Amino acid sequence: TVILAERHDIPVVQMDYQFAGGYSADPAGKPGIANFTAGLLDEGAGERDALSFKSRSEELGARIGAGAWLDSNGATLSALKKNLAPSVALFADMLRKPRFDQNEIDRVKGQWIAGIKQEKVQPSGVAMRVLPALMFGAGHPYGNPLSGTGTEAAISALTRDDLVGFHQRMMQPKGATLIVVGDTTLKELVP
C-alpha cells in the first residue's frame, strides 16, 4: 500500500515504510531482535559497508534510519527533491539488501548492551523493563521491555543468521505500507 500526500511548497520528501510486527513479534527467547535488527539496517547495505553507507547518505543530504516499536517495524527517509532518486536507491538497498556484517553486529551489540545496563539504573528505564511483565505476564508478547531493547543475554546470543532470518520473515514488502509526504508525485515514485 502506498499513501501519498503531495506538498510542493518545500523541496523535501519524507518516506515512512511500515511493516507489521514490532517487538511484540519477537520470538520466544529472543527479546529485542526486532529493534536490534532494525537498528542494523543502516549499518551497511548492498555494496556499501557502514561507513560508505553513512557517507553516501550525508553526500545526498538524506536522513535514513530504521527502528521497531511495539507493534510495527519501520524505516524512514528524508531527502531533498533534487537528490530523491539516488536517496531512494540507497533507502531501497537498506530495506532489501542489509549486509549484517559481523563486525558491525559485534560493535552494535556492545553499544546495545551498554544501553540496557543504563536502562536498569534509571527509574523510567526500570519501569519500562519491569511493568510489562507485571501487567501482561512473562511470555506474553507485550510482556517484554517496552523499550524494545530485550535482555543482555538475548542480545549477546543473537547471531547473524538470527538477524537475516528475522529480516526475511518480518521486513518484507508484502503487507507493508509506504507513506510519502512532500515534493513528489505518484508518477515519480512509481515510473
Which residues does each predicted region cover?
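Short amphipathic beta-strand starts and helix->beta connectors
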Residues: S57-R63, A157-F166
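Short, surface-exposed beta-strand/loop micro-motifs that present aromatic residues
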Residues: T1-E6, G165-R169
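Short, intrinsically disordered, charge-balanced linker/junction segments flanking boundaries
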Residues: T1, G29, E188-P191
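Non-catalytic, conformational "gating/processing" segments within enzyme and secreted inhibitor domains
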Residues: S124, R160-P191
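Peptidyl-prolyl cis-trans isomerase
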Residues: K97-F100, I105, L158-R160
